[in-house]
Amino acid sequence: MKKINKIALAVGGSGGHIVPALATRETFCKEGIDVLLLGKGLDNYPNLCEQDIPYREIPSGSLSISRPIAAIRNTRSLYIGYKKAKKELIAFGPDVVIGFGSYHSLPVLMAALKKKIPIFLHEQNLVPGKVNKLFSRFAKGVGVSFSPVTKQFSCPAQEVFLPKRVWASSNSSKELSSSYSPIICVVGGSQGAKTLNDNVPPALVKVAKDYPNMYVHHIAGPKGEVASIQYVYSRGGVSFCVKHFEHDMLNILLSSDLVISRAGATILDELLWAQTPSILIPYPGAYGHQEENAKFLVYTIGGGSMILEKQLSNEVLTKNILLALDSKTIKNRREALRAYYQNKSSKSFYQFICECL
């Protein structure tokens, strides 16, 4: 097998794609491999500059052809991105290119194919995305976050372990755990979720009548109206912290008794790691992958409950929260999450790639 010295990661878009890419980068850096991130939307991810992570912004466009004008614009962006990606790959000279899904990675994968650079993919969800499905026929292998999705690829596919970056636990997290009960975390993913921001606070105010010592850690997302959410909790007499973004997410999950969230792949992976029960309200778009993610955690693992957005109401949400906070329910769901997580693969993405080359 040829020694791997350099790897390019084709990634961009939401945290659901970028977070696993950064975890993968960490794995390769420990092996002494140079890693470069290439993709659309990386300029909008501030952590890359803060942590001195090498990356190049690559234009891209979606594969949608439903709107002719947009399709023409997207085709032009794809072509510009393809030309730039090819230039960057020639300059960097990677031995392998890994795609993390979404159209943001498309030009880089196209350029890698043209340059005959071995391609690998990573699929975070229970339903493969369009780009990963398309390029899997050319890929050497696919690393996945959840083993059931492996059967949907014709090339070699295997569950791989990605490390979690846990910050040193802050005193505030420890103080919360000792001062409040229960602790509830509300999170709508890296982009936030207006549905959760609008519906969850009023339901938690009702629940607080049965749990006066409750604390809510609400992550509203970049567009969340923090002041409005704070007002609802404050008026309802609920102890809270509302933020646009949380750097210390894993420690927050560890200290929580319940998480109310969308059902993106990253939060699912983190919930399993933290073994924290959840109520999942999947985003109804994006080819239904979040609903499948939620079904897996709820029905296959037994680690929480699911409310479809079309069924969401104050009454339904309140009822689900009260059930989720029952001590027996918490115990059973934690045990189910622990049992599943203990059997997850410990093979690194690097090991998997070495086996496939």
From Swiss-Prot:
Pfam families: Glyco_tran_28_C, Glyco_transf_28. The keyword Cell membrane applies. It catalyses: di-trans,octa-cis-undecaprenyl diphospho-N-acetyl-alpha-D-muramoyl-L-alanyl-D-glutamyl-meso-2,6-diaminopimeloyl-D-alanyl-D-alanine + UDP-N-acetyl-alpha-D-glucosamine = di-trans,octa-cis-undecaprenyl diphospho-[N-acetyl-alpha-D-glucosaminyl-(1->4)]-N-acetyl-alpha-D-muramoyl-L-alanyl-D-glutamyl-meso-2,6-diaminopimeloyl-D-alanyl-D-alanine + UDP + H(+). Pathway: Cell wall biogenesis; peptidoglycan biosynthesis. It is found in: Cell inner membrane. One of its GO terms (molecular function) is UDP-N-acetyl-D-glucosamine:N-acetylmuramoyl-L-alanyl-D-glutamyl-meso-2,6-diaminopimelyl-D-alanyl-D-alanine-diphosphoundecaprenol 4-beta-N-acetylglucosaminlytransferase activity. UDP-N-acetyl-alpha-D-glucosamine binds at residues 14-16, 125, 190, 290. Coiled coil: none annotated. It is a peripheral membrane protein. One of its GO terms (biological process) is peptidoglycan biosynthetic process. InterPro entries: GlcNAc_MurG, Glyco_trans_28_C, GlycoTrans_28_N. Keywords: Cell cycle, Cell division, Cell inner membrane, Cell membrane, Cell shape, Cell wall biogenesis/degradation, Glycosyltransferase, Membrane, Peptidoglycan synthesis, Transferase. Its EC number is 2.4.1.227. The keyword Cell cycle applies. Its main location: membrane. One of its GO terms (cellular component) is plasma membrane. Cell wall formation. Catalyzes the transfer of a GlcNAc subunit on undecaprenyl-pyrophosphoryl-MurNAc-pentapeptide (lipid intermediate I) to form undecaprenyl-pyrophosphoryl-MurNAc-(pentapeptide)GlcNAc (lipid intermediate II). Belongs to the glycosyltransferase 28 family. MurG subfamily. This is UDP-N-acetylglucosamine--N-acetylmuramyl-(pentapeptide) pyrophosphoryl-undecaprenol N-acetylglucosamine transferase.
